Amino acid sequence: MGESARGGGSAETTGGLAAAVKTYLEYTPTGESIPAAAWRRRHRNVRVFVLAHIPLLLALGLYEGTESAVTGATIPPTPGILIAAELGIVGALVGLASIPSVSRRGRTALASTAVLASSVVLVQFSGGFIEAHFHFFVGMAVIAVYEDWLPFALGLVYVVFTHGVFGMINAERVYNHTAAINNPWVWGGIHGAFVLLLAGALMANWYSTERSREASQKRLEEARQKAQQVEDLEARQAEIEAEKAEAKRLKADAEEAREAAEAQQREVAALNERLEATANTYGAAMARAADGDLSVRLDPDVENDAMAAIAASFNEMLDETETTIREIQAVASDVAAASEDADAGVVEIEDASGQVSETVQEIAAGADEQREKLETVSGEMTDLSAAIEEVAASADSVAERSHETAAVAGDGEQTAEQAIADSRTVQSAVESTVQNVEALDDQLAEISEIVDLISDVAEQTNMLALNANIEAARADKSGDGFAVVADEVKDLAEETRASAGDIEALVADIDAQMQATVTEARTADESVQDAISAVDAVVDAFGTVAENAEETDTGVQEISTTTDDQAASTEEAVSMIAEVSDISTATAADAQQASTAAEQQTTAAATISENTAALREQADRLQGLVSTFDVHDESASTAARSE
């Protein structure tokens, strides 16, 4: 029984321990509870903290010897390559921790490693002073701002690993006492244990803080929920009060609506009574109108719009009916009077119709005689028109020939003017040729002078060659070569003089030919000038011919036009005479028809007389019928409507 109890207690203890461990792990911070803005601010401060170490560590690494002013510590020398490498590693870690694309925990790990690396560099550059190891604990406190267990785990591993490894490589730069120098891994573990204890203490504090924070959050959330419930209750109470006020308002509106309905019911009853009285009055008036009293009217000044509209429409109908009856009465009177007048007029028509018939027969006989005379005139006018047309045709032919003459004269004048232009071009060319030949003559004179100069030079060269031969003869054998050259020069001079003579003769021939050319050109120029004068005379003659031909053409054209107009007028007169003849024929026929119509009119007048008598009887009956209706006087009715 006791063993069972102990077994149960052991199980409870084991279960409680597991629950405690689970709870501890749940509240182990990971840094995720820190807001992003706060985390960025803390991360920036950690990086600034590490970067502030670099100039101090550089100064410590470069220092060598015993510092006697304050500490009395002896600092060993540090190779420059080691200083650069280790400070470069610290700076690189800070740079990597600043890259935004790296995850948040990745940058946390890099910044924490940079802090611990600066602690390692401080210990090495100081020569392993135990006081420098305190910087590890400072670094652990700094990275605690991340509130994450990962930096602590990195710190623990980093402290043990660096103390053990660097203690094996150069223990004197890590530790400054013999025990640690001889056992670097043991003392590295001791440092790690202290770091672990520090981390445990901080994490225990975080655990308590997280528990307190969670409890505070729960209480705050509960307070918020209660405040929200209070606000909801207050809002609900306000809604209830509003609903009560709305219910009271609706009740008051219902009372007002009931009272209004009762009042409206009373008004409807009174209105029905007034409508019934108005309907009785309207019925009596309509009965009088049905009996023929068209002067009766309904009173439109009533309360009901429909009854007022009925009264207005009925009054308007009676106004129109009364006006119509009044007009019928007037028309009946007018018809009776007109019937009497028509009866008297019909008698006069019968007498006039006989006279018209006789007159029309006389007109028909005159129209036949006029037609015969017009036919004779039309034949004579036709012959005259044919003669005028022959004259017009001859005038057209003459006009066409005169027009052709004027055109030929114009073409001849243009051709003569073109010949003058061509002659002037030839004259310009001849003058240019004369000028060119004269210029060539001047150049030949210059060539002649040059040939004379060449002849003089050849003569002088010949004299020099002769003198050279004389000098060569005097020089005996030594002048043989000189004599040969002198002979060649002499021969060349002779050839030059001969060529100059030929050129001079040729220039003389050319000069003679050019003189002849100039003479012929001047003669041609004079001939061209004479031709231009002759052609000018021809142009003037053609101009005169063209003007005369144009005047002739104009006159003939006017004659032709006048003749055409006469022919057209004659044809038009013939046509008009034919039309007059046709009109005379038609007039005779119409006169015959008018005579027949006059006879028919006489017969119709008798019929009209009979119909007029019947119409007078109908008008009397109509007056008797409309006299049964009572209507207002027209002037009085108009005055009443205007009012």
UniProtKB/Swiss-Prot annotation:
Residues 345-581 form the Methyl-accepting transducer domain. It is found in: Cell membrane. Keywords: Cell membrane, Chemotaxis, Membrane, Transducer, Transmembrane, Transmembrane helix. GO terms for molecular function: transmembrane signaling receptor activity. Residues 273-326 form the HAMP domain. The chain crosses the membrane at residues 48-68, 79-99, 115-134, 149-169, 184-204. It comes from the Archaea. InterPro entries: Chemotax_Me-accpt_rcpt (IPR004090), HAMP_dom (IPR003660), MCPsignal_dom (IPR004089). It is a multi-pass membrane protein. It holds the Pfam family MCPsignal. Methylated by CheR. GO terms for biological process: chemotaxis; signal transduction. The keyword Transmembrane applies. GO terms for cellular component: plasma membrane. Belongs to the methyl-accepting chemotaxis (MCP) protein family. Potentially involved in chemo- or phototactic signal transduction. This is Transducer protein Htr8. It comes from Halobacterium salinarum (strain ATCC 29341 / DSM 671 / R1). The gene is htr8.
